[in-house]
């Protein structure tokens, strides 16, 4: 199965994106979710270093805690930054990923996140926001 065939993509309407962003901001501000940032990814081994999560975070936020910077930047996303919603068909029980694009220092940054809000009374572990991509485009 190639990469494209295992993904289902769609564009959400403005109301859905606004609702998603409101819930994302609430989750971040409440402190009830963890931020899991994929700083090192296998796909980055084949990429120009400039387009990796590690490089982008170090370049944009050199003197900041990465998690705190991500919390702030995710909270600042707007409906205008939204690109698409993606479902990885290999993992049907995982929530959809949202893709955003935002400009920093005159360069586009590709942001892909997945929010998993787990009910801890039924599942071991905490709710989390997985930041899969935060890199120059």
Annotate each language-model stretch with its function.
Residues 90-117:
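Basic/aromatic recognition patch in beta-strand/loop cores that engages polyanionic ligands
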Residues 108-109, 115-137:
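Enriched for short, Lys/Arg-rich terminal
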Residues 2-15, 19-94:
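Compact soluble domain cores
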